[in-house]
Amino acid sequence: MEKEQIKSQLLSFTKNVWDFLIVILIAAAIVFPIRKFVFQPFIVSGSSMEPTYYTGDYLIIDELSYRFNQPTRGDIIVFSYPHDVTQKYIKRIIGLPGETVDITNGKVFIEQGDKKFELQEVYLPSNVITNKDRTLALKADEYFVMGDNRMASSDSRIWGPVPTDKIIGRVLVTVFSPKKIFSANLSFSK
């Protein structure tokens, strides 16, 4: 009787292990493709996108949208740094393929054929100055990107445009922002 009870418990344990492994395999089969081809986590490192994003901000990157639509001006993207693809950068799109970006006296101008206009960057605080005068004509597969913290950003003003094939995706959502949570201005009255 004892042998049958041990055998029954062993069979039950083995079945539970197999059931657990099957659940893990099914979960992996669902999660892996989503993680690889649709959404990707990204943790901000550095001050180049302040005050929009801070070091430690945990973001979700949408990798799917740009397979169907082109990136647009103002999108915040994550991309492989063109000179070292192992590094991932986060910046805002300023210039689109075929345009010329002209930075003169702290102002950003966009040339589209015979049209030229000053870029109105409403997402930047009013005290932000765009330094490093530069003019760059973009090819049909290139984007001009800059960080929102213009004084502390290494971007297209320094190392040139981002090729389309280096773009990983656009920022979809901020999941967690330690700086914004822990820097809340708390006051207590007596």
Segments the model singles out, each with a brief description of its role:
Residues 2-18, 22, 33, 37, ...:
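Soluble "head" domains of membrane/secretory-pathway proteins
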